[in-house]
Regions:
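CheY-like receiver
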Residues: 12-13, 62-66, 98
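Typically the conserved alpha-helix immediately C-terminal to a functionally engaged Cys/Sec
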Residues: 33-46
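N-terminal "domain-start" segment that seeds a small globular fold
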Residues: 1-12
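Short active-site neighborhood of thiol/selenol oxidoreductases, capturing the structured segment around
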Residues: 15-27
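The canonical Cys-X-X-Cys-His
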Residues: 29-32, 74
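Thiol-based oxidoreductase modules, predominantly thioredoxin-like and allied folds used
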Residues: 3-5, 24, 43, 47-61
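Non-catalytic, surface beta->alpha helical segment in thiol-disulfide oxidoreductase systems
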Residues: 75-102
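Structural micro-motif
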Residues: 66-75
């Protein structure tokens, strides 16, 4: 389950997060919808990871801060800091490998 963030609250949510993934998306992006499903499966693997989402078009400040120009863009958050970023679609196995590498 995703927690929807916006330009006013994303910094506090990231800083308070021990383990998380943030998805920057666009509402009409089919790859973003697929990535949501991938992240749901990823979180179901018992990773204990919080899931966040931010609409790039509605939250330009957050998107600009993280240079999230393409959708979907994934941020890995560990101990309140962004430790990795990747744009594009991944499958659950690739997502797990990416998360572990960050």
């Amino acid at each position: 389950m995703f927690t929807q963030l916006d330009d006013t609250g994303y910094k506090a949510a990231i800083e308070a997060c021990e383990a998380g993934v943030a998805l920057f998306y666009k509402k009409l992006c089919p790859h973003c919808k697929n990535m949501e499903k991938v992240l749901d499966k990823f979180s179901g693997l018992g990773t204990g990871v919080s899931l966040f989402s931010l609409d790039i078009e509605e939250n330009p400040a957050a998107a600009q801060e993280f240079s999230a120009e393409r959708a979907p863009t994934i941020l890995v958050v560990k101990n309140g800091k962004v430790t990795g970023q990747k744009a594009g679609l991944m499958n659950p196995k690739e997502m797990l490998a990416f998360y572990k590498s960050c």
